[in-house]
């Protein structure tokens, strides 16, 4: 069946991706809602800001003349002055007696410091005068009398409320100033001018009508509008980079996705979203107070173009990032940063307008400038419209054009960067690729069937490559020649592939084999174009994979299933398939049919409506494979396609691939050797990046295999030695591989195949040897692979160590002997015999040490605690600096004309103008003009008092005539804060000038520093105490919640099964947590008291706080331990509880203080309740009560308020709570902590009464297997036997477990789901029982019951010599070995530390532990990983570590739940050998669950297969094969020169030997048959006849083997599934989802 190369249009892919993106948007509601609501929220917030800060419009204000200068404004004034000299005393004498008699009282001070000290206790009517010399002085008023701001210019709004400038007049400042000036003038000239100065008038200058614009809300509006559209770009960037991070984009390109379609789909989607959002926002903005005068269309254009450009800016950033969490943050901060740059451009008036548009390539700056222009137009009641697009300092037309150009530029740049920036995967173009003609004019080339010489000549075949048959010559689809790939890792070159050369043929399935890290995935990535080779050549149907344009053509033929699951999480299975089918170019009218076919082929109809993220691991692999086979591609590249699948699912996949292999190329990698053996026509074994061999299974087995396996199922009377002698007599090369009470396994070499018939005849005739049945199977591909791997290690050693190559057998024998010894030593490790108390101390110390180091390594928790501390200390320091910076904030202001008046020749300044001078004296004022000239004051003459007409000006002087001299009216601008005293100073200096004195009077205004009032001090202290309480309560979850993490990863269960005493665990943690929390509290409390030294200190009261602290710390820590048992499903447990603690503390404070105003009694009752009920409150309540008691002048009336009452309960309650928490902790430990193996000396069992569990007899089942029934009777007999010599280590009797499913509302009843159905079995000492079954069969339920995680509904379990119900009270079972399916390992702890922790928990001494670690690392090849943290370990090493931990301490019972999951074949064999050796002839028992039948066959003494919660069969592997096996498999390899006629004769001969043999799919050189068991009456006769046929026909070699355990398993599960379906019972193929509480949901 041929398949044309798919051609798919860009627009069709764009429509498909649009649909995909739309569905994702609909299902990722959180981000989608934020994208919609975030802009609207900001818009409404800005409208609110506009309403709260409208432009203030002020009408024209006429001149306002103030009251005459009145000396009585200084009534009762206390005037202190310093220094005391003759001159200063004379001045103050004249002021107090001549100018202001009966008004002021003078006080003398020797220095300024004395005056300042005295001012602290003076009332507000105290004023200080500090003379610097006879002509200069400083006036010091209290801050509430005069302005204290250093800002020289006030707003119009500020003056309209309380004019600060006029305070100098109303406070008496100018009166005192004029009086002192008059006294100085009189002393200097003997002329009294007090009357003239006293006659000075003050006039507030009239102001024009004006609209005052507040720049702060404007800035907020501009920034918020810039940020408003950021969620679109933020989530878009995160989504695109996340797809890149998951490799989805690159694999979509392999499926034929056009880059244009990818970018266009996002552009169109977000263009639509932003169009609608911009339209809505524009309508709202123009209909509200935000832009009421502007055109909706113009505002819409601005919003729409900015939204587009900001989104495209985010698109441009995506090629620059590899992590999605980084790109979103950068996009947001770039948006804010450029928004502020644009704001600065607008606010800085001196910024050159010509340079503004230099920032136009950044859309955020351009948008800010445009919105600023809209606001500018709004100020003039015009608004933005099409008529004024070109008006203003920043024309809107330029903004619109630049935003449009920005959008185009960003999209083009995004596409360009995506093509040229090198990434982890994918081919990249050169930086100037768009200039090459080949890019614009691609020439299509059709693939061709290449002959042997098309590529680099003929690849020479050697002894490691099996030649293909003639029918495949010329069908080389994939040519690989000299491929090399080198990576840079930590500064070193790592060779992933080394000179790899071989061909892959059309019509064959080729398997790539090799352990982890050999380069299989790298080769796959090269073939599909994900990464280029460093050297060498590879082609797919003539298309070179290193050429990007040719690779695009090759990809049209490729379907790929990578190691990573490629799918869209929120889409359903059917949606994923449909969308990717459309991307692949499958015709629209065929998509539904194609998708349904894939769903049917892979048995996914029942999950087609499930979201991909909710699928199990095996189901996700099915989906990825289904995506790969969509459209029936010419080439399939599958990287571990069946990883994580159960055997039934794997067989479904195998059948699918076999069905689709004709005229196609299938390449897959796998760690399952049986999968490669059954499925692949050719296998390529890669080791260390080099090719070890290529050929069929028979070629590999015959060349590198170890022979046949002869398995015998024996009875208890079997004469093992006689039997072995018989086997050796016929086949001297036979070796005994495995031996137990029920089975013997021998290895028979290939070279002795002609002697097999004689051996089997002898076995048939010697029935007295105790052989019940026997079978023979050929060496597995696993054995071949391992032999090649050992050879690879020898090759590697040759180059570095040996000068002469040792024999392979010697090396192999030596290495395995060493490993055997290591493992025997490992299996003999014992826990030290220590007393219970010594063990308790050792465990407590170990847990404390581990907890301490864990806290040090948990950077997130440490950072969180330090951040909270930093917040508290920052607030403390900030408030302290604010408190002590008032003195520094009060700066002296020199009242000189330079503040507001220009000098002649100066240019206008922000608030500097010329001095207006009005002559109302009708006389010559030339001398006055001369004075201003001498003082460098620019003067502007006016004729009348219409100051508004010449506005703006800072001040004016109106010259009026008096009897002796001029009298002035000081006209000041109310926005110029210091203009009035400056005018008075100018007038005084004019009088001096007029009297021919060249010196000038200088004056400073310096307000007194006023201490913070007592109420402010109390509020500040109260606030900081409350802050301490809120922050300190947020800390314990960050270091005392480790138990929650231990429960999540099941580490606590593992520790308990290892013999950990619960009290040692909790006290060990408390030993670290309590001192740490205490130190933190002491630091915070100490800083609170240190920064508030004014706190009135009572020793007794402080001791009460200390006693409260001592009880509070353990109370909160213990409560946190109890809280860790709850809300286990929360992702961020520590953050969640930290937030809850803080909110609870804040709520308690708020409630108690609010109710205080309702009545003291209510507040006290609540305080008592909170102290008793809420453990985080007592310290807070105690501290606040202590502060209130310690306040100075606090009310002492006990009837109304007595803080001592509140203090006492806060001190006592933590100690009572500690007692309660200890009992509660024991209760939760008993209920949720799982089984304790050892008896705890401190934690007593709360209930010694055992549960009355029902022990019903199982219902009669006539169809129950006889072996299962015999096992049940055996268990029943053993349970009733009181004098048995040796009971089994594990006995399970009638174990039944039901789960309550969700209530069926239609039937108003609960539906029971049965997990296990009356299971009975036993495991003898020294035996390993394999527990097999498909997913949901009940294996994990049994394991969880055995470890105590869940309770059975009925039945009994006995472990060791005691029942599991009473094992907690008996100390006979010191520890149990448990290797769970999920690694219970701490990610930041090293491998060696794991050994040390578990060794100490199991009672091993430190000296023994060092030796044990050395043995374990040698035995399991872990030495190089000892100092690595778990998160850096490969999956296989983690499983080895779990196994090693389960074996520490010589446990009597070990439970191994899928121990070799995730390991490559070499590591699996290593693990299996370790398991076999550890339990070899030992008095310990083990149960092993697995999905790998070869694992059960290699490790287990007996196997029990479960289906649908029932035990289907039990027995040795050979027994099950003989009983349930359907037959044998015969494979014959013919010699090359055989003719078709002879092949026909051979087939007739096979049909004669095995009449019912059915021929399987074969090639011209290989014949394969399935032989029914009925046709093999005798193995000896079968081998005898096959040997005759080998000599009579051109047979090069053959293999004849029994059905594998995998085939038996599949047949059993299929039969059971048919029975279940017919009876309507639970289907075994359905997955059960197990929660942490082990509830099963159907």
Curated annotation (Swiss-Prot):
Catalytic reaction list: cholesterol(in) + ATP + H2O = cholesterol(out) + ADP + phosphate + H(+)
Molecular-function annotations in GO: ABC-type transporter activity; ATP binding; ATP hydrolysis activity; ATPase-coupled transmembrane transporter activity; lipid transporter activity
Tissue: Ubiquitously expressed. Highly expressed in testis, skeletal muscle, kidney, liver and placenta. Expressed in both the epithelial and mesenchymal compartments, present within the outer root sheath (ORS) of the hair follicle as well as dermal sheath. Expressed in multiple regions of the brain, including the hippocampus, superior frontal and inferior temporal cortices. Strongly expressed in neurons and moderately in microglia, with only weak expression in astrocytes and oligodendrocytes.
InterPro entries membership: AAA+_ATPase, ABC2_TM, ABC_transporter-like_ATP-bd, ABC_transporter-like_CS, ABCA, P-loop_NTPase, R2_ABCA1-4-like
Glycan-modified residues: 86, 458, 996
Binding site for ATP 2: 1333-1340
Record key words, sorted: ATP-binding, Cell membrane, Endosome, Glycoprotein, Golgi apparatus, Lipid transport, Lysosome, Membrane, Nucleotide-binding, Repeat, Translocase, Transmembrane, Transmembrane helix, Transport
Domain (ABC transporter) ranges: 478-713, 1290-1533
Post-translational modification: N-glycosylated.
Residues the entry annotates as binding ATP 1: 514-521
One GO term of the biological process aspect: high-density lipoprotein particle remodeling
Subcellular location(s) of the protein: Golgi apparatus membrane; Lysosome membrane; Late endosome membrane; Cell membrane
Membrane topology reported for the UniProt record: Multi-pass membrane protein
Residues passing through the membrane, by range: 32-52, 220-240, 264-284, 297-317, 328-348, 355-375, 396-416, 866-886, 967-987, 1021-1041, 1071-1091, 1102-1122, 1139-1159, 1169-1189, 1207-1227
Family under the similarity heading: Belongs to the ABC transporter superfamily. ABCA family.
Role, per record: Cholesterol efflux transporter in macrophages that is responsible for APOAI/high-density lipoproteins (HDL) formation at the plasma membrane under high cholesterol levels and participates in reverse cholesterol transport. May play a role in the processing of autolysosomes.
Protein's name in the database: Cholesterol transporter ABCA5
Species per Swiss-Prot/TrEMBL record: Homo sapiens
Organism lineage: Eukaryota, Metazoa, Chordata, Craniata, Vertebrata
């Amino acid at each position: 069946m041929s398949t044309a190369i798919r051609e798919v249009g860009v627009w069709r892919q764009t429509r498909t991706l649009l649909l995909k993106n739309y569905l994702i948007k609909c299902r990722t509601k959180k981000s989608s809602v934020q994208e919609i609501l975030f802009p609207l929220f900001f818009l409404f917030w800005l409208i609110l800001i506009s309403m709260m800060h409208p432009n203030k419009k002020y009408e024209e204000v006429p001149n306002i003349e103030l009251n005459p200068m009145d000396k009585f404004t200084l009534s009762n004034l206390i005037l202190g002055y310093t220094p005391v000299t003759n001159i200063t005393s004379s001045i103050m004498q004249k002021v107090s007696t001549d100018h202001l008699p009966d008004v002021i009282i003078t006080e003398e001070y020797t220095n300024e410091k004395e005056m300042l000290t005295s001012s602290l206790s003076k009332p507000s009517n105290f004023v200080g005068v500090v003379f610097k010399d006879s002509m200069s002085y400083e006036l010091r008023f209290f801050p509430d009398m005069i302005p204290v701001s250093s800002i020289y210019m006030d707003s119009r709004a500020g003056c309209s409320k309380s004019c600060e400038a006029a305070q100098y007049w109303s406070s008496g400042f100018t009166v005192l100033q004029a009086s002192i000036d008059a006294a100085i003038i009189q002393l200097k000239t003997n002329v009294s001018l007090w009357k003239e100065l006293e006659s000075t008038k003050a006039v507030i200058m009239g102001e024009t009508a004006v609209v005052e614009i507040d720049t702060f809300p404007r800035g907020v509006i501009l920034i918020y509008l810039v940020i408003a559209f950021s969620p679109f770009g933020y989530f878009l960037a995160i989504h695109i980079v996340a797809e890149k991070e998951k490799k989805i984009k690159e694999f979509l390109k392999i499926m034929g996705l056009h880059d244009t379609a990818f970018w266009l789909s996002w552009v169109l989607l977000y263009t639509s979203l932003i169009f609608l959002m911009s339209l809505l926002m524009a309508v709202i903005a123009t209909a509200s107070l935000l832009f009421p005068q502007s055109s909706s269309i113009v505002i819409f254009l601005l919003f729409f173009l900015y939204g587009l450009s900001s989104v495209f800016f985010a698109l441009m950033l995506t090629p620059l990032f590899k992590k999605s969490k980084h790109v979103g943050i950068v996009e947001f901060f770039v948006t804010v940063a450029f928004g502020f740059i644009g704001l600065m451009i607008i606010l800085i008036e001196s910024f050159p307008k010509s340079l503004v548009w230099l920032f136009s390539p950044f859309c955020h700056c351009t948008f800010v400038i445009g919105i600023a222009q809209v606001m500018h137009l709004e100020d003039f009641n015009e608004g933005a419209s099409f008529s004024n697009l070109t008006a203003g300092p920043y024309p809107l037309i330029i903004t619109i054009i630049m935003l449009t150009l920005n959008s185009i530029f960003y999209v083009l740049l995004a596409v360009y960067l995506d093509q040229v920036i090198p990434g982890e995967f994918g081919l990249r173009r050169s930086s100037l690729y768009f200039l090459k003609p080949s890019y614009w004019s691609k020439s299509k080339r059709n693939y061709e069937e290449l002959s042997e010489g098309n590529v680099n000549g003929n690849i020479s075949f050697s002894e490691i490559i099996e030649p293909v048959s003639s029918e495949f010559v010329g069908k080389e689809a994939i040519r690989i020649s000299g491929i090399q790939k080198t990576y840079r890792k930590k500064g070193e070159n790592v060779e992933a592939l080394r000179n790899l050369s071989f061909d892959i043929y059309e019509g064959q399935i080729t398997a790539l084999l090799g352990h982890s890290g050999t380069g299989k995935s790298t080769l796959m990535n090269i073939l599909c174009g994900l990464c280029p080779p460093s050297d060498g050549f590879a082609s797919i149907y003539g298309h070179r994979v290193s050429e990007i344009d040719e690779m695009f053509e090759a990809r049209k033929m490729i379907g790929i299933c990578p190691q990573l699951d490629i799918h869209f999480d929120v889409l359903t299975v059917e949606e994923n398939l449909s969308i990717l089918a459309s991307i692949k170019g499958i015709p629209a009218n065929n998509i539904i049919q194609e998708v349904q076919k894939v769903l049917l082929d892979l048995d996914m109809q029942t999950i087609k409506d499930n979201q991909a993220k909710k699928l199990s691991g095996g189901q996700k692999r099915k989906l990825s494979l289904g995506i790969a086979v969509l459209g029936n591609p010419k080439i399939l590249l599958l990287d571990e396609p069946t990883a994580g699948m159960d055997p039934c699912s794997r067989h479904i996949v195998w059948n699918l691939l076999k069905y689709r292999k004709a005229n196609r190329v299938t390449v897959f990698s796998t760690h399952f050797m049986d999968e490669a053996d059954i499925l692949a026509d050719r296998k390529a074994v890669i080791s260390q990046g080099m090719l070890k061999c290529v050929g069929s299974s028979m070629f590999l087995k015959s060349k590198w295999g170890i022979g046949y396996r002869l398995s015998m199922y024996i009875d208890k009377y079997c004469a093992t030695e006689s039997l072995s002698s018989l086997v050796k007599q016929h086949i001297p090369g036979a070796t005994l591989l495995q031996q137990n009470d029920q089975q013997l396994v021998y290895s028979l070499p290939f070279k002795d195949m002609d002697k097999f018939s004689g051996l089997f005849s002898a076995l048939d005739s010697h029935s007295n040897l105790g052989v019940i049945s026997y079978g023979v199977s050929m060496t597995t591909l696993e054995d071949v692979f391992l032999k090649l791997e050992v050879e690879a290690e020898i090759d590697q050693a040759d180059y570095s160590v040996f000068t002469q190559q040792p024999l392979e057998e010697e090396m192999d024998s030596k290495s395995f002997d060493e490993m055997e010894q290591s493992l025997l030593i490992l299996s003999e490790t014992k826990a030290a015999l220590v007393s219970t108390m010594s063990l308790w101390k050792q465990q407590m110390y170990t847990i404390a040490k581990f907890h301490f180091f864990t806290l040090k390594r948990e950077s997130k928790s440490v950072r969180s605690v330090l951040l909270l501390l930093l917040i508290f200390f920052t607030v403390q320091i900030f408030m302290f600096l604010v408190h002590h910076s008032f003195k520094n904030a009060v700066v002296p202001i020199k009242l000189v004309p330079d503040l507001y008046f220009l000098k002649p020749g100066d240019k206008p300044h922000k608030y500097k103008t010329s001095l207006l001078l009005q002559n109302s004296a009708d006389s010559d004022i030339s001398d006055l003009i001369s004075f201003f000239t001498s003082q460098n004051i620019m003067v502007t003459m006016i004729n009348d008092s219409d100051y508004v007409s010449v506005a703006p000006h800072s001040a004016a002087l109106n010259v009026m005539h008096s009897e002796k001299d001029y009298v002035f009216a000081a006209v000041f601008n109310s926005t110029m804060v210091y203009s009035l005293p400056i005018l008075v100073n100018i007038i005084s200096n004019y009088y001096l000038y007029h009297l021919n004195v060249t010196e000038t009077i200088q004056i400073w205004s310096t307000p007194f520093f006023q201490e913070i009032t007592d109420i402010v001090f109390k509020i500040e202290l109260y606030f900081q105490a409350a802050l301490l309480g809120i922050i300190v309560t947020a800390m314990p979850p960050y270091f005392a919640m480790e138990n929650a993490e231990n429960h999540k990863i099941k580490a606590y269960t593992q520790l308990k099964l290892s013999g950990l005493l619960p009290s040692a665990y909790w006290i060990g943690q408390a030993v670290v947590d309590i001192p740490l929390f205490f130190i933190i509290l002491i630091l915070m409390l100490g800083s609170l008291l240190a920064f508030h030294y004014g706190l009135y200190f009572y020793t007794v009261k402080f001791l009460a706080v200390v006693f409260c602290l001592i009880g509070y710390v353990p109370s909160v820590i213990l409560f946190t331990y109890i809280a860790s048992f709850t809300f286990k499903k929360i992702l961020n447990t520590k953050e969640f509880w930290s937030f809850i603690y803080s909110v609870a503390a804040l709520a308690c404070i708020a409630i108690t203080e609010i109710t205080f105003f309702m009545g003291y009694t209510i507040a006290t009752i609540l305080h008592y309740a909170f102290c008793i009920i809420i453990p985080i409150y007592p310290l807070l309540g105690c501290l606040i009560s202590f502060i209130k008691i310690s306040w100075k002048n606090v009310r002492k009336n006990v009837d109304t308020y007595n803080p001592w009452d509140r203090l006492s309960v806060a001190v006592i309650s933590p100690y009572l709570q500690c007692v309660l928490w200890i009992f509660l902790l024991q209760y939760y430990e008993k209920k949720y902590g799982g089984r304790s193996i050892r008896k705890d000396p401190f934690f007593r069992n709360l209930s010694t009464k055992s549960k009355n569990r029902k022990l019903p007899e199982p219902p009669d089942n006539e169809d129950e297997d006889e072996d299962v029934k015999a096992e049940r009777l055996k268990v029943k007999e053993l349970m009733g036997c009181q004098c048995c010599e040796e009971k089994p280590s594990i006995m399970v009797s009638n174990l039944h477990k039901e789960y309550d499913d969700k209530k069926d509302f239609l039937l108003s009843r609960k539906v029971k789901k049965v997990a296990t159905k009356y299971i009975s079995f036993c495991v003898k000492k020294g035996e390993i029982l394999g527990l097999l079954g498909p997913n949901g069969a009940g294996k994990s339920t049994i394991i969880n019951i055995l470890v105590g995680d869940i309770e059975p509904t009925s039945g009994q379990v006995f472990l060791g010599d005691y029942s599991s119900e009473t094992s907690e009270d008996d100390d006979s079972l010191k520890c149990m070995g448990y290797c769970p399916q999920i690694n219970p390992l701490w990610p930041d702890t090293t491998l060696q530390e794991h050994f040390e922790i578990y060794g100490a928990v199991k009672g091993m001494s430190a000296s023994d532990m060092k030796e044990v670690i050395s043995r374990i690392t040698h035995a399991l090849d872990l030495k190089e990983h000892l100092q690595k943290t778990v998160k850096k370990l490969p999956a296989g090493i983690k499983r080895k570590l779990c196994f090693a931990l389960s074996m520490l301490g010589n446990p009597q019972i070990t439970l191994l739940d899928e121990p070799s999951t995730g390991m490559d074949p070499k590591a699996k064999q290593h693990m299996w050998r370790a398991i076999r050796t550890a339990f070899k002839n030992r008095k310990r028992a083990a149960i092993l669950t697995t999905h790998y039948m070869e694992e059960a066959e290699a490790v287990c003494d007996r196997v029990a297969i479960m289906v649908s919660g029932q035990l289907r069969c039990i027995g040795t592997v050979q027994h099950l094969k003989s009983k349930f096996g359907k037959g044998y498999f015969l494979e014959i390899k013919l010699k090359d020169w055989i003719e078709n006629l002879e092949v026909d004769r051979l087939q007739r001969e096979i049909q004669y030997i095995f009449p019912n043999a059915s021929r399987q799919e074969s090639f011209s050189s290989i014949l394969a048959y399935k032989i029914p068991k009925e046709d093999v009456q005798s193995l000896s006769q079968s081998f005898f006849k096959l040997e005759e046929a080998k000599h009579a026909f051109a047979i090069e070699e053959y293999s004849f083997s029994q059905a594998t355990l995998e085939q038996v398993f599949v047949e059993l599960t299929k039969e059971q599934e048919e029975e279940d379906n017919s009876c309507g019972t639970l289907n075994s193929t359905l997955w059960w989802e197990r929660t942490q509480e082990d509830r099963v949901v159907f």
